[in-house]
Design a protein with these regions (language model features):
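Amphipathic alpha-helical dimer-interface segment in Rossmann-like NAD(P)H-dependent oxidoreductases
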Residues: 1-8, 49
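ABC ATPase "signature
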Residues: 10, 23-24
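Residue(s) in the substrate-gating loop at a strand-loop-helix junction
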Residues: 19
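Active-site loop immediately N-terminal to the catalytic Tyr-X3-Lys motif
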Residues: 24-31
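Active-site helix of classical SDR
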Residues: 36-37
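C-terminal helical subdomain
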Residues: 53-56, 60, 76-118
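Short, flexible catalytic-loop segment of classical short-chain dehydrogenase/reductase
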Residues: 63-73
Length: 118
């Protein structure tokens, strides 16, 4: 893990891109995918706490469906028009990175549509 190296600088930002499926379980999503995204969110929180006193800030960004080739051809997935654009996620990452040390975002769900959970 990079944490020991970042601690030496007394400053750092770690952004993990998880998923809204790391915040809930849906029957239409693979258990393995959901499990990995839950683990990534949990690891982000553990790393955030472990690095806090060394000036390290960690954020788990949890987007909904993003308009990439990954989702093409999967039945039951939102249409391209309903998905988040990759640029939206990039802008969000840029914003989180611009925050001062005393304004830490632990996790940030980004929905592309009305969600009943999160």
């Amino acid at each position: 893990m990079c944490l020991p190296h970042i601690k030496k600088t007394n400053y750092g930002r770690i952004i993990n891109i998880a998923s809204t499926d790391g915040k809930r379980y849906r029957e239409s999503v693979s258990v393995g995918y959901s499990m990995v995204k839950h683990a990534l969110v949990s690891m982000s929180h553990a790393t955030r706490i472990a690095g806090w006193n060394d000036g390290i800030r960690v954020t788990a960004i949890c987007p909904g469906a993003v308009d990439t080739n990954l989702l093409n051809g999967i039945p039951g997935v939102t249409t391209s028009k309903q998905r988040l654009k990759p640029e939206t996620i990039a802008h969000t990452v840029s914003y989180v990175l611009s925050l001062p040390k005393n304004a830490s975002v632990a996790e940030l769900p980004i929905n592309a549509r009305v969600e009943s959970t999160i």
